[in-house]
Amino acid sequence: MKRLPDNLFVSQVSIPGTHDAATGNGVTLASYSQCQDIDVATQWSIGIRAFDFRPKVKGDYLNINHGIAVTNLRFDDALYLLRDSLKEHPSEFAVIHCLYASGYDSDKTKYETMLRELLSREDLKDYFVPFRRDLTVGDMRGKILLLSRDQYAGKPITGGFFQSWCGWLDWNAQSSCSIIGESAASDYKSPLWVQDYANTKDSEGGVAKKVSAVTEMLEHSTKHVTKDESDVVWVFNFASAYPGSISMANGYRENATYTNAAIIEYLQTHEAGPTGVILMDYCVDRSPNEVDGKYLTRGRELVDTLIANNYKWLERRNKTVYDKALERIDKLYEQLQEAQESIATECADVAAEFEDELAAAKDVIDQQKYEIDSLYAGWLFTESYTVDYIGTYRIIRQIEKDAEKAQAEFDEASGIHAVQAEYIGNDCQIFSLTGERLDALRRGTVCIVKFPDGKVRKVVCK
C-alpha cells in the first residue's frame, strides 16, 4: 500500500482478505473447518490485509474459532501480530471482520467484558482507528480497523459495527447494509454493500449462483464512482462458500477453485475499478499447500491480481481526469494566444501596457499545468477534480476588454476615431495623412475621411 496516495478513500481500495484466517494456524476438526493452508503471519507476508476473525470465550481469554472448531491462535495474539507487522511496515493497514464464533447469547456478558478489555489495552489501543465513512489511506496507515457484526457495546470502543448484514441473494438487501462508528453524525455512518452467500449446495446449482453473486458484486463495486465523501460506499465481497449440505474443508477448497478464478478472470477482462474487501478461502495457488495439490485454488494469484488492480484502476482514473484537465489547459493557452494577437493588432498603440498582465495570465495557466502534472505523477487525482477554466478565461477576456478600452481612449485623445469599415459608405472620400486619395480604408492605419455632410475626421479602421 506504500504507493497508494494518502487522499484515496479506503472504500476505493481493492483489499485482499482471508475468510476464517486463523484456521491456517491449525484447527481442530480440520477436515470440516479448515479454510486456509498458511498461517496469519504468512498471509500478511504475501499481501493479505483483511482478516476474518471469529473470537470465542475460552477460559480466561478469547480464542479464535471457526464455529465449534478451535484454532491454535488466540485473538490477542492475532492483534499483537498485526500490531507488530504494522510497526515494521507503517505504510500498511489492516481491516478485521469480527464475528463471535458461536453461542453469542450464552457468552454475551463475558465476551463483551473481555473484548472491551482487550481493545482498551495500553499497548494496543493506539493502533486502532475509529470508523468514518470517509477514512483515507493516509488516515489508516499503521492502523487496524476492526468492524464487528456483534454489537458488543452501546457504541464501538473502536472501529465500527456492521448493521443489517445480508447473507442471501437479494440486491435490495445486499445494498441496504451499513457500517456505523462511535458517533451518530452522518460522517460516522456509511452505506455498505455485502455479498456473503455461503451455502452453495450442488443440487440447487449453488456454485453457479455463488460465482454469479461474486461477479455481480464486482460489477457494482468496480463501476461505482466516488467523487467525494457523499458518494462513499464500502464493499465486502465474500469469495468463500461450501458446495455441500455441511461445511467441509474440501468443499471450501472446491468452491475456491471456482470463485477465485472467476474474480481473476473478471479483473483481467473488465475495466479496472475498486473491488472493496474480498475475503477468500485458501490464499495459495494449490491446496493442500503442495506443488501437486489437488485443488487449483489460485489464491496467491488472486492476492496479486487484487493488489495490481489498485494501480490499474488508479492509472485509468488518473489518465481520464488528466486528459480532460489537459484539454482545458490547452484551450486556455489558445485563448491567451488569441488575446495576445488581438491586442497586438487591434490595440497596437497601448499593447505594451498589457504585456505584464498577459504574462501574469500565462503564469496562472502554467501553474495549473504544473499542478495537473504533479497530481498525475502522484496518482492524486480524484473524480471531482476540475481545472478553473472559467475563472482563468475571465481573466484573459478582461485583459482584452481593458486593452480595447485603453486603445479607444488613446484614439479619442489623439483625435482619431475607431470605426468599422462598413460604416464608411461609398459616398465618403478617403485620404491618407499625406493627402493621397484612397479607394478604401486600410485596416490598422489612420486615414482622413470626408463625409457627405462635409465633416472631416481622422479614423482608424478596426
Model-derived regions, located:
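Long, acidic (Asp/Glu-rich), low-complexity accessory segments flanking structured domains
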Residues: 1-46, 59-88, 93, 153-157, ...
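Conserved, mostly hydrophobic/aromatic
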Residues: 54, 96, 146, 278
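Active-site groove signature of glycoside hydrolases
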Residues: 90-105
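Surface-exposed substrate-engagement region within the catalytic domains
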Residues: 121-272
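Low-complexity, Pro/Thr/Ser/Gly/Ala-rich linker/spacer regions in secreted
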Residues: 312-334, 401-419
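Long, hydrophobic or amphipathic alpha-helical segments
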Residues: 318-326, 332, 339, 343-354, ...
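C-terminal outer-membrane/trafficking sorting elements
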Residues: 345, 411-462
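Repeat-associated, polar segments at repeat-unit boundaries in modular proteins
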Residues: 373-411, 461-462
